[in-house]
Regions:
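Charged, low-complexity intrinsically disordered terminal segments
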Residues: 1-131, 140-225
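Histidine-centered active-site/metal-ligand motif
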Residues: 134
Length: 225
């Protein structure tokens, strides 16, 4: 992830504070503010968005985030999404489709060798497959980030009808984002990170458009949340 000198948060004062090694932060204990902060970063990004998540569910919240990322990619923002393969295969078709976009790169961390019969991995490859990535991070333009305890799923954002998790995130801007950028690079280039095409196949442009319409319809149907 690059740190861009020209970005939407750049002011003389903010640059001076960052040069002094200072970091501004905001605790996001409210679930709505937490998801809104992520979406705001995606919508304001001009150059790049890097994301790393342990859980990204095939639900309304997951679809809304993917829809926002796809719109960002459409306007020229470079997207890098790293997901732990603990998610399962529910998102495979969507990820295949999105990875065909020229501005959208997707990798799986430590993918299961037998992705549709995972019990085999647990029986014979437990030591290897137990090495998971629990990161929960989004960095926009290399200068502002959100991290914390929330995965991308309804239960983390007061959008589930059954139960909710109580978590805390931090929105931060300044010198500490350099560490977040280093984390992005470290895990993205890790030997256990594989492109989604290597493990779940190649998508098509038709799939991208189907996914786009599906995300839009799902998001519109939940406007009351």
């Amino acid at each position: 992830s690059a740190e861009y000198t020209e970005h939407w948060l750049a002011t003389t004062n903010s640059t001076e504070k960052t040069d002094q090694g200072l970091t501004a932060y905001l605790a996001l204990d409210d679930a709505f503010m937490s998801i809104a902060s992520r979406i705001h970063l995606i919508r304001k990004a001009k150059h790049s968005i890097d994301l790393q998540y342990y859980i990204w569910n095939d639900d309304f919240i997951g679809h809304m985030m993917l829809h926002e990322l796809l719109k960002a990619a459409d306007r020229g923002v470079k997207i890098r999404l790293l997901l732990d393969d603990q998610n399962g295969t529910q998102l495979d078709e969507s990820l295949q489709a999105l990875a065909t976009h020229p501005n959208f790169e997707i990798k799986l961390f430590n993918p299961y060798k037998y992705r549709k019969f995972r019990a085999i991995d647990y029986l014979f490859r437990l030591k290897h497959i137990n090495h998971r990535m629990h990161n929960k991070l989004i960095v926009a333009d290399g200068v502002i980030a959100v991290t914390g305890g929330r995965n991308i799923s309804r239960e983390y954002f007061d959008a589930s009808e059954s139960f909710q998790f109580t978590d805390l995130d931090i929105l931060f801007f300044g010198d500490a984002v350099k560490n977040a950028n280093q984390t992005v690079i470290q895990f993205w280039n890790d030997d256990l990170s594989y492109s989604v095409q290597q493990w779940s196949g190649q998508g098509t442009k038709q799939q991208v458009e189907r996914s786009r319409q599906h995300y839009l319809q799902d998001t519109q149907s939940h406007n009351d949340l």
